[in-house]
């Protein structure tokens, strides 16, 4: 157990002993009704939180129980998007977009109209926190008279501009993208409504300004495409405004005037842009000739603007960013990325909301945040109760390559696992997609080669991706894994299985739709990597299987306990 966990346990036990003594004294104290107050047993009071944590493998920070309990109470009290503070047209577009991406294959629902969309735990917790109105009591309606009123007005203006920092941490595949985009789009729409109600000319002038209002940064171009496509899809959704907006709001003159404006009818009508792989700086600058509401990109693409010799002040367009999301923050704040990420953040001088979003909270990430924001109270943490727990709908199986007939060959073990999955009768009629993770990119190509040449798999069924694979080629190879499973007869290659061999590069944030099988060819180096790899299946409460192949070198006794950890819902540390 790490020193961090040891300290927590010691503090917990110390506090519990005081509680035991307190209850022991009360145990014999008579109440008015002559009843005895029973003391909780010492075993109950001193039982610490169970954690699956071993030596250097342990890389995850344990959030405070108080933070998790706060989220739990909010989650239990809300079961509908209508109960959350979301701008009405944003809510309508979001629900339709979520339905659009739902996989209806192998379900009893005939259409998306039969599907009731409910917010996930992280969406409830994050939207409630981030969308809380700032406590601003402005005196703008009249001229401040006294010194106290002037001071109050200045404080209100300062609070309106003050940076708020949020962290969102929730299990993989839990709907984190909408957990941060719903509040962001809501605030953009509310600001537009405020400008429109000042005057239509003020609103029109703001829309024509060459600025970026909100920024989402991610570590890879695949993730840029993924988030951009979600936002663009929501922006493209059409609906009758008077049917999706509460009649009470439409009777409010402030909402009615804005929502009935020609550029607000029947959709979001936002300007969503991406600055991704292969895009020149000219694509970005041409897109900012009028206001960009949301830009999705990587820190590297933004920092690359510094190399431009023929563009005057290329970063000036970022001076007005008010909302920024650092998605896959555990990656973007690690040693490989942190310089580029923090350089981008320093340019956002007018940012009001800064959101760090991640599926895990590595210890290193927590230390980095503490250095950036030494006052712990300046960060608002949003964690779900299931954080750092492998979902119970995922079945984990350990395969020992040391036993017969594998005789120490992990590759033979993998080939047999692929054969067994191919013939196990699951996903009948559909192409089975399987992800295989290795630790080193140098092992990807040789493994693909041996699976084809030695074990008789078709070349079109086994593909490999590393950081060296060109973006356009990567996009084509990934396509079958990023959409719902196809019927075998509809697949261009008539494949019954498709296998992707890759590294942790593809384990971060990628929404592999409906993937049922993940194989860990190599034992992950840390618990952080384990959670991300396992999280490519079992997304959005769907079932999945994870096969961990071990041999003499990696067959440590503790990893064999992983299936039991999942069944008992134990936190991974």
Curated annotation (Swiss-Prot):
PROSITE patterns, alphabetized: HELICASE_ATP_BIND_1 (PS51192), HELICASE_CTER (PS51194)
Keyword Membrane annotated: no
Main location: mitochondrion
Gene3D superfamilies referenced in this protein's UniProt entry, alphabetically: P-loop containing nucleotide triphosphate hydrolases
Record-stated family: Belongs to the DEAD box helicase family. MRH4 subfamily.
Domain Helicase ATP-binding positions: 157-379
Domain notes: The Q motif is unique to and characteristic of the DEAD box family of RNA helicases and controls ATP binding and hydrolysis.
Motif (Q motif): 116-123
Domain of life: Eukaryota
Transit peptide residues according to the UniProt entry: 1-39
Cell compartments where the protein resides: Mitochondrion
Lineage, broadest ranks: Eukaryota, Fungi, Dikarya, Ascomycota, Saccharomycotina
Root EC class: hydrolase
EC number: 3.6.4.13
Domain Helicase C-terminal: 413-573
Motif (DEAD box): 327-330
Recorded GO MF terms: ATP binding; ATP hydrolysis activity; RNA binding; RNA helicase activity
Role summary: ATP-binding RNA helicase involved in mitochondrial RNA metabolism. Required for maintenance of mitochondrial DNA.
Catalytic activity reported: ATP + H2O = ADP + phosphate + H(+)
SMART domains in the record: DEXDc, HELICc
Keyword Transferase: no
GO cellular component, one term: mitochondrion
UniProt-recorded name of the protein: ATP-dependent RNA helicase MRH4, mitochondrial
Native source species: Meyerozyma guilliermondii (strain ATCC 6260 / CBS 566 / DSM 6381 / JCM 1539 / NBRC 10279 / NRRL Y-324)
Cited InterPro entries: DEAD/DEAH_box_helicase_dom, Helicase_ATP-bd, Helicase_C-like, P-loop_NTPase
């Amino acid at each position: 157990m790490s020193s961090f966990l040891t300290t927590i346990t010691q503090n917990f036990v110390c506090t519990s002993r005081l509680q035991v003594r307190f209850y022991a004294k009360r145990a014999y104290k008579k109440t008015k009704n002559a009843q005895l107050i029973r003391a909780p047993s010492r075993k109950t009071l001193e039982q610490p939180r169970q954690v699956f944590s071993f030596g250097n493998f342990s890389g995850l920070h344990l959030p405070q129980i108080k933070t998790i309990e706060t989220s739990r109470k909010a989650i239990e009290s809300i079961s509908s998007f209508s109960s959350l503070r979301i701008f009405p047209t944003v809510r309508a577009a979001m629900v339709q977009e979520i339905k659009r991406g739902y996989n209806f294959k192998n379900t009893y629902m005939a259409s998306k109209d039969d599907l009731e969309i409910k917010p996930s735990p992280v969406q409830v917790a994050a939207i409630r926190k981030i969308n809380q109105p700032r406590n601003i009591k402005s005196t703008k309606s009249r001229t401040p008279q006294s010194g106290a009123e002037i001071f109050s007005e200045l404080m209100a203006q300062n609070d309106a501009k003050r940076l708020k920092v949020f962290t969102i941490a929730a299990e993989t595949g839990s709907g984190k993208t909408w957990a941060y985009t719903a509040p962001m789009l809501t605030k953009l729409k509310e600001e537009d409504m405020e400008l429109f109600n000042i005057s239509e000319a003020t609103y029109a002038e703001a829309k024509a300004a060459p600025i970026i209002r909100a920024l989402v940064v991610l570590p890879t171009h695949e993730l840029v495409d993924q988030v951009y496509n979600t936002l663009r899809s929501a922006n493209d959704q059409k609906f009758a405004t008077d049917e999706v907006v509460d009649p009470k709001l439409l009777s409010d003159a402030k909402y009615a005037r804005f929502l009935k404006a020609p550029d607000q009818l029947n959709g979001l009508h936002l300007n969503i842009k991406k600055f991704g792989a292969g895009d020149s700086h000219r694509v970005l600058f041409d897109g900012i000739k009028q206001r960009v509401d949301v830009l999705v990109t990587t820190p590297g693409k933004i920092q690359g603007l510094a190399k431009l010799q023929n563009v005057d002040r290329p970063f000036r367009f970022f001076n007005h960013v008010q909302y920024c999301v650092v998605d896959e923050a555990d990656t973007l704040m690690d040693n490989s990325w942190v310089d580029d990420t923090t350089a981008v953040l320093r340019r956002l001088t007018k940012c009001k909301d800064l959101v760090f979003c991640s599926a895990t909270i590595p210890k290193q990430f927590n230390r980095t945040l503490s250095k950036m924001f030494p006052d712990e109270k300046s960060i608002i943490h949003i964690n779900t109760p299931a954080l750092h727990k492998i979902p119970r709908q995922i079945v984990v199986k350990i395969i020992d390559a040391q036993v017969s007939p594998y005789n120490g060959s992990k590759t033979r073990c993998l080939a047999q696992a692929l054969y067994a999955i191919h013939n196990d009768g699951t996903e009948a009629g559909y192409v089975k997609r399987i992800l295989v993770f290795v630790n080193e990119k140098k092992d990807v190509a040789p493994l693909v080669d041996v699976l084809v040449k030695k074990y008789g798999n078709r070349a079109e069924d086994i593909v490999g991706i590393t950081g060296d694979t060109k973006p356009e080629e990567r996009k084509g190879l990934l396509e079958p894994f990023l959409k719902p499973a196809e019927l075998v007869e509809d697949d261009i290659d008539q494949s019954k299985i498709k296998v992707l061999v890759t590294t942790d590069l593809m384990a971060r944030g990628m929404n592999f739709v409906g993937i049922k099988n993940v194989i860990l060819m190599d034992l992950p180096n840390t618990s952080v990597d384990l959670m991300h790899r396992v999280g490519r299946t079992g997304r959005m409460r769907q079932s999945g299987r994870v096969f961990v192949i071990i041999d003499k070198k990696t067959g440590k006794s503790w990893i064999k306990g992983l299936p039991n950890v999942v069944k008992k819902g134990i936190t991974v540390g």
